[in-house]
Amino acid sequence: MKARTLERVRPRVEHFARLMGVTPTSVSVTSAQKRWGSCSSTGKVHFSFLLAEQPPEFIDSVVVHELCHLVHHDHSPAFWDMVRRYDVHFRSKRYQPG
């Protein structure tokens, strides 16, 4: 399942990273079940294996969210402005894994 998730996520990370002008230091898939993704202070972006079963527009939303953390390391208004700028599927509703 992790390999399938990476196959689905990596092209979207590459697309949005290029569009947004950011570069993650690495992209990986984890066994996390309580969060869709995370971004470390060193630029490593991690995604839950559970994304493999989600629709493409949801994957894009998670990818954009995590890549925005490469610029804004918080959930400030500037962070959410950036999310809205790049995520055409932005929804205020929060989705919980599992």
Where are each of the predicted segments found?
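Active-site-proximal or metal-binding-adjacent scaffold patches in catalytic folds
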Residues: 1-61, 70-98
